[in-house]
């Protein structure tokens, strides 16, 4: 029995194409002829073993029983190797096919057949153990690849979720900073408008007072000129009036100067406050630019992660193809070619990538679903550029 025929044991019964009746009968007839030749040769030699020869008619009857019960023997051998039946059942089957063994009377032909059968069974069992071990190794390797692919996919999904959460937080902070900045700008503009109005009023008041002082000086000069043309009056009367007028005007001038000093102090305070607001505005603008730079960095990191994800997927597909090529070049490829389609294990090295492509992919920004990873990446880049 060859290695190719040994794989039939995996099923419940052997294929008719692999074990035809004509071939079985020809093998039985050939074995019968060999047994007859062995008996003829041993009859010419002195007996060395205490055994009684069996007649030719009994040998022919055993061949007929072997021909009719070959399928049952094959099934019992398969069940015994697979551990489905006990050794006693197989012994009873052998004794039923070789009745001479029960009476300790066996021909050389039966002994040779029994030895060949046991040799074939042992070789078949060893081959099945090797095939089962190989298939178990392939199964473990496939499970390991699938688990690694699932772990990578889970890690990438978690990282995308973290990036999405950070983007959402930065977006909220950006909106809050914009609102605060707009509010402060409005306050600064309102305060600046009020200060401009006060400065205009102060300028008008100072200009009015200055014009009044100039007019009074002109009047004083005119009065001095007219003083020479008029008749001299008592000096003490005119001097007292003029002194009172000068004192009064001096008081007005001092009062205007004091108000001017107060307004200047108010203007300085407003300028200091304006400088503080300006510094706050510049700091906020710097923070906003910093946040924009961090956002660009996060976008670059996200795109690099997407490229790295694509490279890993392509590398995984290439490794699956390489493993598939190696598996087809193994020495067991010739043996597996004779398996039936329902008995042949199907190894799909690209199963992880196909399951990844069959699952629905969603955009982390707009939650739009896609079927292809490349389309999703281009859409995510467009969404990030829009935002």
UniProtKB/Swiss-Prot annotation:
> Quick one: a GO cellular component term?
cytosol
- The residues the entry assigns to the signal sequence are none
Task: State what this protein does.
Answer: Essential signaling component in transmitting the lipopolysaccharide (LPS) signal leading to cact degradation, which is required for NF-kappa-B (Rel) activation. Required for antibacterial immune response.
Supply the name of the protein: NF-kappa-B essential modulator
Q: Name one Pfam family in it.
A: CC2-LZ
InterPro entries reported for this sequence: CC2-LZ_dom, NEMO_ZF, Optineurin/NFkB_EssMod
Which Gene Ontology BP terms does the record give? defense response to Gram-negative bacterium; defense response to virus; immune response; innate immune response; negative regulation of stem cell proliferation; peptidoglycan recognition protein signaling pathway; positive regulation of antibacterial peptide biosynthetic process; positive regulation of defense response to virus by host
Main localization (coarse) = cytoplasm
Q: Where is the composition biased (Polar residues)?
A: 325-337
Whom does it interact with, and what assembly results?
Answer: Interacts with IKKbeta to form the I-kappa-B kinase complex.
Q: Where does each CCHC NOA-type zinc finger lie?
A: 355-385
The record's region (Leucine-zipper) falls at 302-332
Which PANTHER family does this UniProt record tie to the protein?
Answer: NF-KAPPA-B ESSENTIAL MODULATOR
Residue positions binding Zn(2+): 363, 366, 379, 383
Gene field: key
Q: What is its subcellular localisation?
A: Cytoplasm; Nucleus
């Amino acid at each position: 029995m060859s290695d190719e025929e040994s794989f039939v044991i995996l099923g419940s019964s052997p294929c008719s194409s692999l074990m035809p009746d004509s071939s079985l009968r020809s093998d039985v007839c050939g074995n019968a002829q060999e047994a007859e030749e062995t008996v003829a040769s041993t009859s010419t030699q002195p007996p060395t073993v205490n055994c009684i020869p069996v007649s030719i008619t009994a040998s022919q009857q055993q061949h007929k029983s072997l021909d009719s019960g070959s399928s049952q023997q094959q099934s019992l051998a398969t069940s015994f190797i697979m551990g489905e039946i006990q050794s006693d059942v197989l012994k009873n089957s052998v004794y039923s096919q070789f009745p001479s063994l029960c009476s300790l009377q066996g021909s050389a032909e039966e002994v040779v057949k029994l030895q060949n059968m046991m040799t074939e069974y042992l070789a078949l069992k060893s081959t099945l153990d090797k095939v089962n071990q190989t298939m178990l190794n392939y199964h473990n390797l496939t499970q390991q690849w699938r688990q690694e692919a699932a772990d990578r996919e889970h890690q990438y999904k978690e990282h995308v979720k973290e990036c999405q959460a950070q983007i959402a937080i930065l977006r909220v902070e950006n909106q809050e900073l914009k609102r605060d900045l707009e509010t402060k700008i409005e306050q600064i503009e309102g305060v600046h408008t009020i200060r401009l109005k006060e400065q205009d009023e102060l300028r008008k008041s100072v200009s009015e007072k200055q014009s009044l002082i100039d007019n009074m000086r002109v009047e004083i000069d005119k009065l001095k000129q007219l003083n020479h043309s008029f008749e001299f009056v008592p000096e003490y009367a005119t001097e007292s009036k003029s002194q009172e007028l000068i004192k009064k005007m001096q008081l007005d001038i001092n009062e205007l100067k004091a108000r001017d000093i107060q307004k200047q102090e108010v203007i300085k305070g407003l300028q200091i406050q304006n400088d503080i607001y300006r510094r706050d505005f510049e700091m906020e603008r710097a923070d906003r630019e910093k946040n924009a730079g961090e956002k660009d960095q996060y976008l670059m990191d996200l795109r690099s992660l997407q490229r790295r994800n694509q490279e890993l997927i392509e590398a995984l597909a290439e490794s699956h193809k390489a493993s598939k090529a190696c598996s087809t070049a193994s020495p067991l490829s010739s043996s597996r070619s004779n398996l039936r389609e329902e008995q042949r294990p199907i190894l799909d090295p690209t199963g992880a990538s196909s399951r990844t492509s069959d699952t629905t992919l969603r955009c982390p920004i707009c939650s739009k679903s896609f079927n292809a990873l490349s389309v999703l990446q281009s859409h995510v880049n467009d969404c990030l550029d829009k935002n």
